[in-house]
Amino acid sequence: MKVKLISALNDTNVDAAQVSNQRQLSISMSAIPVGFEQTLPLNLCLILDQSGSMSGEPMNTVMQAVEQLLDQLKPGDRISVIAFAGTARVIIPNQIVSDRNSIKTQLKVKRKAAGGTVIAEGLSLGITELLKGTKGAVSQAFLLTDGHGDKGLQIWKWQIGPNDNKRCLQLAKKAAKLNLTINTLGFGDDWNQNLLEKIADAGGGTLAYIENPEQAVTQFARLFRRVQLVGLTNAHLLLSFVPGVRLAELKPIAQVAPDTIELPVETDANGTLVLRLGDLMKDVERVVLANIYLGQLPEGKQVIGHLQIRYDDPSLNKQGLLSPLAPIYANFTKSYEPALNSQVLQSILLLAKYRQTQLAEAKLALGDAKGAATMLQTAANTALQIGDSSAVTVLQSSATRLQVGKELSKSDQKKTRIASKTVLKE
């Protein structure tokens, strides 16, 4: 596998007479097969909520989705299953998939509903099981819950009992450092979208919403297709600029595809900016958008920075590989005329849709329904410019409900969050 790495500015031409110019830098990355390369072995862990609220049809449909996923695993793939409620336990220890029927039987025999929702304990066991099969494989977890983690009790400055939500985020970050990807699936209407989004973002995965039980099979299959497309893992973007070029200070970099995520930026000992991206898929670009400022440089085509990807290749069992160093160009001219890039504009709009929705949610939390409605209407208009008709429907519906004095249901809130993060075409 090799890395496809392309960069572009929203406007390639820069006014050389200006002391400072702002630009949006789009960086797209994907894995490229070299010759005939087979799909990488998978190392999957399913972390499933078996609390009492999941009993009956919800659990039955989840088990149906799990069985269909098992049927798609290939020889050499690995599976493990964790169940959690008031406590967490290993249902299927990490193993090579050889006898699917035996695994399915164990799932049916060992499943049982109980009280409580200790998400962090389930996630911790899942990480432990995944680590048993990481060599030469794509290691990912599917974490499904229909509830909220136990936050314990806080009295003034003292925390009494474990804060499950806080520990979940710590574990997701730990998983990312161990080259494990955590995907989250919210089931029904009563799960914590803030928590599951943060877990997926920190764990390099994606957030899915199962509104009705019959959607479980579809959402599991959608995530599984993404896992099958992974060609390279543990990818980090290395970004450096020439003197006079810098990142914006506030929220300078975000991923805009395949999901929108605000990305944390670190700086290494050499001053290079480092961003963890996670897995790179074949034929599906991961797109990052950086907000940069350019100082004055001489007229002509100038190198304003360099890009490189550091990654692992499971097929070769090699870590820390580097793609060729790629220059970033801008054309400085005193006879400035815009040279706009329509693809970068799409990336700008994707990020705008997400941030506009975030602002709407913040206003709603403060009781400003009118302000929230205005921002959701703006986000719907942005989605219309992108051509994301499904998001337009969701965002417009939420805006309209607020405009006429109605509250957003839990389902509305979750649909709105998903619409803000993704292009709803899958």
Task: Describe the residue ranges of each PLM region.
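Low-complexity, intrinsically disordered segments enriched in Ser/Thr together with acidic residues
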Residues: 279-300
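Local beta-strand/beta-hairpin segments that build beta-sheet-rich folds
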Residues: 91-93, 287, 301-306
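Long, acidic serine/threonine- and proline-rich intrinsically disordered regions
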Residues: 294-426
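Extracellular adhesion/glycan-binding regions together with long Ser/Thr-
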Residues: 258-284
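OB-fold and OB-like beta-barrel modules that bind single-stranded nucleic acids
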Residues: 26-28, 290-292, 307-309
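Exposed acidic/Ser/Thr-rich ligand/metal-binding surfaces
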Residues: 2-234, 298
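Short structured motifs
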Residues: 8-13, 221, 272-277, 291-292
